[in-house]
Structure formats: C-alpha cells, structure tokens
Swiss-Prot record:
Keyword flag Plastid: no
Catalytic function, reaction form: 4-imidazolone-5-propanoate = trans-urocanate + H2O
Signal peptide limits: none
Protein name as annotated: Urocanate hydratase
Organism placement in taxonomy: Bacteria, Pseudomonadati, Pseudomonadota, Gammaproteobacteria, Enterobacterales
C-alpha cells in the first residue's frame, strides 16, 4: 500500500528550451507534459496533484510523482514504464517503437465500479482518479475543451436559430477546468452567457485568463447585463457567484427564458464536485471527510432540483442539453424519472463529426516558445486551405485564447487530416522551422476512444451504447502502432461505473522513425472512430470508411448484402 502524501507546498513548471533532462525527446516529452499538468497556470489544485474535474490527478501522491519523474529521467529508449493509477509500478525491456509509457488509471472490475468502492481504495492509497487527460498527462487547460464547446454551440445555433447566435444567451454553470471553457466558447460563437459558479476563486481565475469577461454582483445585476448586451447583439460572458441548484429554480420562478441551457458542474462526483445548496465550500470539504454518505445524498438532492429546473426550461421549448457531467443520471437516481427527457450534447450536435473521425486533435510546443504554435497554425491553414470554419477558429484562438503552461493548440480535424498535419509538424522539427519537438495528443472524448452511455455513446442507433470493447481496441491499436504513451482509464467525465476511455500521445522529434510512428498512429487512431460508428450502421461513417479505404470486413459484407 502506498502512503498518502497529497499536499506539497511547491510550484512545478515544465522545463523549456532544447536542453534535455531525460535521455531522449520521447521520455523528455512525457516528463514535461506530466509537469505541465501541474503548472499553477494549468491545474486546478496543483499542490494536491489535482489537475481538473473534481479529483482528477496527475499522480497518486507526491512520493509516486517523484518516482515517476526519476523513472522518466533514467528511462532508456528500449524500455517502457508502467503506471498503475498514478503509481510507477514497473519498467520493462521492450523496443524502440514501443510506447515509452503505458498508463492504466481508475479501472475497476464492473461489479465494484462505483464511487463508494473507489473512494475506499482511494483513501487507502490504492487508486487514483485520472479523469481523462489529468492522469494521462496531456491536459492543456481550458483550451482543451473550448473548441468542442464552441462547435456544440455553433451547431445548436444552426439547428435552432437559423445559424446565428447574435442577440442570444446561454445559461450554464461550472467554471472549473472543463466548465471554464463555456463562457469563451459562447462568446466566440456569438452568444452572451450567464455562467454560475459557487467558488469565487474559480471566477477570479477565469477572469484572469480572459475566459470570462465580467462578474455580476447578484442575479438582478446579471440579468440586467444580459438584457443590455443581447439587445445590442454584443457577445459578452458574465459570471455569477452562487449555487446553480438555487439560481436555476429562481430563474424558472421568475419566468426568465434563456435561449439555451446546459451545465458543466462537476456533478459526476457528488462527494468532491457539487456543492449542496445552502452550504459553503469549506463546510462541504470538511464534511466530505467525516460524513461522506450524508454529503453525497445532499449533493444529489440539489442536483435533482437543478435538473428539475433544466426540465422546466426544456418543457418551455428552450434548447436544453446535458454537457457530459452525468447530472441527469444523478437526478434520475433521486427520483427525477424524466431526467433524460433532454438530450446529451453528443447525440444532439456532435455525432456526425465523430462518424468522420473528427475530434479534438491537440499539440503542444515542448520548447515553450509561442512562435512554434503560431507557425503550426499557419501550417494547418496551408494544408487544409478550403476549410473556412477551421481557419476562423484558428484566428479566434490566436486572438482570444491565452496559453496556460506550455503553448498549445487544439482544432477538430479527422481521419486523413491528422496524419497529414502530424507528418508536417515532424518535418518542421527536422528542418529547424520549429525550435524543439512537439507532442500530439487528444482528449479521451473522441470518436473511437470512449464508451460512455450517458455521453459520447449515448443513444447509439444500434443500441451499443455500453459496449466498451472499442476503447480497449483503440488503446491496443495505438500501442501496436507506436504511440509514445498510451492510457486506458475508467470513469472520466461522468464518474465511476459510467465510462471507459483511452488516450494516446505521439512525439514529433523530426526523425524518420518518428515519421513512421506518426503516420501509423494518426491514421489508425481516428480510423477506429470511423470503424466504431460504421459498425453501428451510421451511413456517414460507412461512406467515410469507403472513401478512406478502411478494411472493415463486416461492414463491407453488410454493404454487399444491401447492394
């Protein structure tokens, strides 16, 4: 059993420049990205190893963190480090094209895959919640979800408001590592937003990083600001310190009609992520240590009231959707029978992108030099010249998104495009156009890397929502393809028992060997998403598979029968 030492009063920042601490760029990349996850400009609570998402950690405790760092510094290019729930458990001889790190976080046998059992293991030092990109060392701050949220809002605007969100406003809550992307995403999509957050420190952080424009003093002030800005068609994001379980029902009582309603509180984790109404944060954290069952029940009662208010907006005909935090399930558990009457964001707005393998492609400049990102932005535009929507995103991102930690960029691209971009970035490193290598990764929220029946795989047309073979196959294939590190997690986004998901990162160090790995990984990884959706019978995915020349035996057989 590992001793629990989860607080250390220090500050971690990733090394920058071209001088290596580790033995190669492959292991240096993992080292820098682990440290970048805990940069105070990136992580939500770095002194306790918490990156984002309630208790999503980068390492199990500080002893484990120190050993991971030591292991990465000394790791050879024919060795692989194994990480078990944030703990380095072994180093094995493999080969140069094998991953340098393999990570498994938070995985439990299904019968025991619940928060109660996980929390027992966590308290004993036997487990760690890795969220999605916290424990897989590829979190890039709120930018990591901005474009996905932006794409969701834009598509909602197309479906419900004729393609424009000018003069419209979004009601939501949660300004943590994920939810903090919402105000900026809404602004970039052309909408105003009212963003409720119960911790003033999180509002302060989003104001500092320019993800939120203004803070209202109270609800009346917030509504007055919304009225003023929507009347003039100006997109401004407004934060309000308060509890969503109190404010949303009050808005319903007042007859206020937002144009769109969603939520990104950390409702997936009632013990650590959702403040019961009438409580303050300090009381919540203290009682969580001594009365966990009471705290969980109180949080879920408040979630039920929160969802009842969302249902009221839905029943008014207002577009209302779950943004993947499992709040509907929590409310349903508390007797809100119609909690699932409003949809999740993936089936409502995002699935057609997933069918083409399009998802959150991200890269990070290990040099620490922002110019390296700006040069790659230009390369993306040059290689994908006809996608005006993508170009608009990159322009807005450069203007509005402040880098957190190592400079990074995200853009949603799909099968075919990812490998093209990765190979181009590798060539830029080789030629010296970029000052140091870059890493390419993605969120676990992607087209072929997650099984999550209340989020990414909700309402699959063949009923395969809960089949989790797909993320396992994705992880295995990325390992076989030579990704630099591969991760397989449980419970990210929606909590214990509700998801399994995998991630990968590949390093562009300018070498021929890297080019071969990049070509394999960045083709095969999104191809598994097309495969998964084609197997479920989505015509968009079947057509994409045919266009891209994927060899999918059963899909080909099915198409043959149809013809």
């Amino acid at each position: 059993m590992t001793t629990q030492n989860r607080f250390r009063d220090n500050e971690i920042r990733a090394p920058q420049g071209t001088q290596l601490t580790a033995k190669s760029w492959l292991t240096e990349a993992a080292l820098r990205m682990l440290m970048n996850n805990l940069d105070p400009d990136v992580a939500e609570n770095p002194k306790e190893l918490v990156v984002y998402g309630g208790i999503g950690r980068a390492a199990r405790n500080w002893e484990c963190y120190d050993k991971i760092v030591e292991s990465l510094i000394n790791l050879n290019d024919d060795e692989t480090l194994l990480i078990q729930s944030g703990k380095p458990v072994g180093i094995f001889k493999t080969h140069s094209n094998a991953p340098r790190v393999l990570i498994a976080n938070s995985n439990l046998v299904p019968h025991w895959a619940n928060w109660e059992h996980f929390n027992e293991l966590d308290a004993k030092g036997l487990a760690m919640y890795g969220q999605m990109t916290a424990g897989s060392w590829i979190y890039i701050g709120s930018q990591g979800i901005v474009q996905g949220t932006y794409e969701t809002f834009v598509e909602a605007g197309r479906q419900h408001f004729g393609g424009s969100l000018k003069g419209r406003w979004v009601l939501t809550a949660g300004l943590g590592g994920m939810g903090g992307a919402q105000p900026l995403a809404a602004t970039l999509a052309g909408a105003c937003s009212l963003n409720i957050e119960c911790q003033q420190s999180r509002i302060d952080f989003r104001l500092k990083t320019r993800y939120v424009d203004e803070q209202a003093t109270d609800l009346d002030d917030a509504l007055a600001r919304i009225e003023k800005y929507t009347a003039t068609g100006v997109a401004v994001s407004i934060a309000l310190c308060g509890n969503a379980a109190e404010i949303l029902p009050e808005l319903v009582r007042r007859g206020v009609r937002p144009d769109m309603v969603t939520d990104q509180t950390s409702a997936h984790d009632p013990l650590n992520g959702y403040l019961p109404k009438g409580w303050n944060w300090e009381e919540y954290r203290q009682r969580a240590q001594h009365e966990p069952a009471l705290v969980i029940n109180a949080a879920k009662i408040s979630m039920a009231e929160h969802v009842e208010a969302m249902l009221a907006f839905h029943n008014m005909g207002i577009p209302t959707f779950d943004y993947g935090n499992n709040i509907r399930q929590m409310a349903h558990d508390m007797g809100v029978i119609r909690a699932f009457d409003f949809p999740g964001f993936v089936p409502a707005y995002i699935r057609p992108l997933f069918c083409r393998g399009i998802g959150p492609f991200r890269w990070v400049a290990l040099s620490g030099n922002p110019d390296d990102i700006y040069k790659t932005d230009a390369k993306v535009k040059a290689l994908i010249p006809d996608d005006a929507h993508l170009h608009h995103w990159l322009d807005m991102a450069r203007e509005r998104i402040r880098f957190q930690g190592l400079p990074a960029r995200i853009c949603w691209v799909g099968l075919g495009q990812r490998a093209k971009l990765g190979l181009a970035f590798n060539e830029m490193v080789r030629s010296g156009e970029l000052s140091a290598p870059v890493v390419i990764g993605r969120d676990h929220l992607d087209s072929g890397s997650v099984a999550s029946p209340n989020r990414e795989t909700e309402a699959m047309q063949d009923g395969s929502d809960a089949v989790s073979d797909w993320p396992l196959l994705n992880a295995l294939l990325n390992t076989a393809s030579g990704a630099t590190w591969v991760s397989l997690h449980h419970g990210g986004g929606v909590g214990m028992g509700f998801s399994q998901h995998s991630g990968m990162v590949v390093v562009c160090d300018g070498s021929d060997e890297a080019a071969e790995r990049i070509a394999r990984v960045l083709h095969n990884d999104p191809a598994t998403g097309v495969m998964r959706h084609a197997d479920a019978g989505y015509d968009i995915a079947v057509n994409c598979a045919q266009e891209q020349g994927l060899n999918l035996p059963m899909v080909a057989a099915t198409q043959g029968k149809k013809s």
